[in-house]
């Protein structure tokens, strides 16, 4: 039996099996419709396993990046992280001289999947520190959301908001609180003069590591902060 005859015999058996399946049988009326149905099932199955493979690969690459950042130190070296400085992790645009069309060249798939995901929202529990002591028995809780306007001017906007934006946002949230006004009123304005963005807002990541001012230009996803985390902040007066 030739290879062609073997294939046709196998195809016929598969089509006959499909005719016995619930729902599928209504699409098979003859040999041609059977072939079309069989083709769509085979292609769909291949596409499913391909997507499954890509999803697993993506998860593993992101997990490796997350574990690397979790093990790393919180210092100025993060400004030189390879994903921030290397163009291999980012797409490029150039203009074709002949056609005048702007062409976008994307990064490799493994580089794209390895990048950390930007932080879109988080909760911050904040306490007020006066003379080294916590003033509030129940911390203030702010829900912070970030929009594209917060990071559209960054060199790498796909990594989201920087620590500076979060620090500034919390500073203004607290200054708008009635608690702040009451404290300042009781202290005769002395606390207002001492409370600044640089000296008065201490932010910690989800591992309770202090995030210093010298990394304010680093985006949150590199600082052991993920979307949905609850982190801590201290307002020093």
From Swiss-Prot:
Q: What happens when the gene is disrupted?
A: Causes lethality under aerobic growth conditions. Affects the methyl sterol oxidase reaction performed by the C4-methylsterol monooxygenase ERG25 and leads to an increase in intermediate sterols and a corresponding decrease in zymosterol and ergosterol production. Impairs Fe-S cluster synthesis via increased degradation of YFH1. Leads to increased mitochondrial oxidants. Leads to an increased accumulation of iron from the culture media.
Q: What keywords are assigned to this protein?
A: Endoplasmic reticulum, Lipid biosynthesis, Lipid metabolism, Membrane, Steroid biosynthesis, Steroid metabolism, Sterol biosynthesis, Sterol metabolism, Transmembrane, Transmembrane helix
**One term under GO cellular component:** nuclear envelope
The superkingdom of the source organism is: Eukaryota
Cystine pairs: none
Q: Name one GO biological process term.
A: intracellular iron ion homeostasis
Q: Does the keyword Membrane apply?
A: yes
Q: Which residues cross the membrane?
A: 36-56
Q: What else is known?
A: Present with 2950 molecules/cell in log phase SD medium.
Q: What is this protein called?
A: Ergosterol biosynthesis protein 29
């Amino acid at each position: 039996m030739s290879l062609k005859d073997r294939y046709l015999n196998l195809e016929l058996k598969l089509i006959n099996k499909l005719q016995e399946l619930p729902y599928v049988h209504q699409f098979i009326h003859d040999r041609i419709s059977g072939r079309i149905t069989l083709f769509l099932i085979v292609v769909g199955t291949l596409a499913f396993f391909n997507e499954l493979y890509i999803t697993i690969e993506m998860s593993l690459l992101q997990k490796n990046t997350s574990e690397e950042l979790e093990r790393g130190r919180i210092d100025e070296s993060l400004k030189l992280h390879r994903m921030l400085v290397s163009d291999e992790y980012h797409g490029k645009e150039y203009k074709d001289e002949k056609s005048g069309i702007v062409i976008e060249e994307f990064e490799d798939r493994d580089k794209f999947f390895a990048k950390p995901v930007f932080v879109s929202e988080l909760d911050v529990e904040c306490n007020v520190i006066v003379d080294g002591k916590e003033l509030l028995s129940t911390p203030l809780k702010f829900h912070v959301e970030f929009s594209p306007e917060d990071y559209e001017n960054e060199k790498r906007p796909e990594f989201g908001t920087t620590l500076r934006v979060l620090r500034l946002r919390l500073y203004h949230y607290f200054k708008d609180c009635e608690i702040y006004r009451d404290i300042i009123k009781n202290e005769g304005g002395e606390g207002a003069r001492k409370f600044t963005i640089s000296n008065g807002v201490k932010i910690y990541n989800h591992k309770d590591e202090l995030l210093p001012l010298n990394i304010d230009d680093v985006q949150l996803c590199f600082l052991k902060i993920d979307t949905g985390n609850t982190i801590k902040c201290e307002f020093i007066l």
